Amino acid sequence: MSQVSIKQFAETLKLSVDKLLSQLEEAGVSGKKEADFLSDDEKMTLLNYLKGLHGEKVDAPNKVTLKRKQVQKLNLSSGAGKRTVNVEVRKKRTYVKKPETVEEPVVEEPIVEEAVVDVPEMDTAAETKATKEAEAPKEKAAEAPVSPETILDVVPEPVPVETDKKHKHDKKKQNKAPVKEEPKHKGKPKPKEKQSKKTLAMSGDQSFGRRRHKGHKKSHNADNEHGFQKPVEKQVRDVPLGETIKVSELADKMAVKATEVIKTMMGFGSMVTINQVLDQETAQLVVEEMGHKPVLVNENQIEDDVVNQDYNGETVQRSPVVTIMGHVDHGKTSLLDYIRKAKVAHGESGGITQHIGAYHVETGHGGVTFIDTPGHEAFTAMRARGAKVTDVVVIVVAADDGVMPQTKEAIQHAKAAKLGMVIAINKMDKEGANPDRVMQELVSEEVVPEEWGGDTQFVRVSAKSGEGVDDLLDAILLQSEILELEAPLEGPAKGVVVESRLDKGRGPVATVLVQAGTLRKGDIALCGMEYGRVRALVNETGEQVESAGPSIPVEVLGMSGVPVAGDDMITVESERKAREVAMFRQSKHKEKKIARQQKSKLDNMFNKMEEGEIQNVNIILKADVQGSIEAIVDALVKLSNDEVKVSVVSSGVGGITETDANLALASDALIFGFNVRADAKAKRLIDSEGIFLKYYSVIYEIIDEVKRAIEGKLAPDFKEEIIGVADVRDVFKAPKIGLIAGCMVTEGMVKRNNPIRVLRDNIVIYQGALESLRRFKDDVPEVRQGMECGIGVKDYNDVKVGDQIEVYERVEVKRTLD
């Protein structure tokens, strides 16, 4: 303790300086002034003096006697019966403090609190230690150094002597700080109680692991403690973070328990579970909050190495890729038929295109690749995909129909993709053709023809007679020459999956439009999450080919699964690399799907809490091609409203299986088959369980069916219809009934038990029910126009002359989506 002045010490004790000086003089510390300093010895002298004034002994007692009395009861049986005898055992033990001898221990600077000495108590450990030493031979006790304390037992037993074992390890103890004397508790020693053994040894401790034999009394009581030091400073770790990471994985990387991460997320206001997937930004915030350093990792490196391939070969001129777009039934496929000299439209259900068709045509003007897209509004995604891979867009507009919604949408797709545009005004052979009106409507969509000073070519054609088709091809080739279309011929093939389907005999089939390089039979192809060796290449006429260059569409067989339409296709060197990338994409897709599901669960929970239960129409959809599924799902989901939600539980390419039927049974779903059929097992289950199943070949019919299902679940509307009006002519009281209004029915009829309104000056003053209806003292069910009657209004007695009573009924009106 550092020296302090008398003034500071008085302030600390909250005494006046004069009083402190007088107490110091009484304690024997004289000659001090206010500015003088007090040493620790002087403070101890003052403390001992003050304790003496209060009757406390400063020094600890040299001798302490402990008395103990124990009473027990013994049950004795004799001839007279059982007797209870009280047995009292008295014990007396004296503790004598002997003067310290041998060496002086290294003592630190004493502090005031150490001067306060209470009566020594003996704890359990000390008792056990003393008992063990008492059992030792007297020769050993004589050799050991004498302890400051010796226990003397008044009971006729040998006096136990506590040996100081610490002196046997003086060399180890000299450099250590002095250990505080352990407090001792009162009580009887337990000689048979064993001390708990420590299992970890300090590094360098030679006594660890030795067996203590009964015959040897050599002490091995070195503290067997662990040798490693607990880290004091918090470790800051570099935590690598990918696009997504589970909570448990994040906790492992930070070397903390998952509960700590969950607590941190709760602090952010987000409830998560140990298996929940976090996005990169959220994980970064958590890592920074917990004091570690986030390291953002590009997990797509393996994917980038495969996808980003350079082409060093020469580029060659390639055929233009032309997408034909327009409104439904405007003659897109018929125009392509005339060019191809084939009848594609007749093969489509309903005469409308429901798949993307890719065809390469060699004309007298050169090769052109055509992509025919559906015109129906449900196929927006298909049209957008067609615009993505094309060079020139031909927008077909019927001369007798004009610009329609899908025509406008096609124009928007072409403008968004910044593609060259050619307008084909079709059906010029029809009587009602009006090309000038079509041109005027297109100008309002900012598509101005060249003859009117714009930059868009307009060609008048007829798919039926062939009028203007050559002019259209010339316009397409002119547009492609302006674009200077080139692509490398050698190197790995790159392309886009235009359409995909599951063929019963050939397996997964992907229609691929090659954009660069050459795709050959036997190449390892990677399409999105699917891969495989190309077993066969089939062109648009059904013939097998050995290779396909840029701008050539082919059907690829041999994929591991049905790729998603719109995925990029690329050939890689080895199947191992393709498998690695495909598996990586699948795992990433699965993680994102789980994250979306978790989010949608929370969203649904909050929506249900806010809006109440929403009716659901669950649907299982199976189709022949991937593009049709995409279009139908998009169209069906758009039918959802605030009251009824359309959920596509499952969708896929291929026939309807028993698994689909079981899923429909579990989720109470409707099964729709689009150009596919159910197998025998599925049919048996569907028939036995009464599951809804319908087959369709035209998309309109599916949409209409789902509309009917939604309308059946909509809550009906109720419409109020006024069926009669009566004027109050007189008011009188009737016994047991109350106030009766004498009325004349002026309109319609008045029916008993119908709801009514009471109007005064054309303002509704009461709304209730008609309780009684009488005519000439007789109860009647109804009274028609022009007749008098008495009306009793339920729970209302304020009817006056001149009021009107309006009788109405609620009519249920079935709601529709239109």
Curated annotation (Swiss-Prot):
The keyword Phosphoprotein does not apply. One of its GO terms (cellular component) is cytosol. Transmembrane segments: none annotated. Residues 426-429 are annotated as: G4. Residues 128-228 are annotated as: Disordered. Residues 129-142, 178-196 have a biased composition (Basic and acidic residues). Residues 372-375 are annotated as: G3. Belongs to the TRAFAC class translation factor GTPase superfamily. Classic translation factor GTPase family. IF-2 subfamily. This is Translation initiation factor IF-2. The lineage of its organism: Bacteria, Pseudomonadati, Pseudomonadota, Gammaproteobacteria, Thiotrichales.
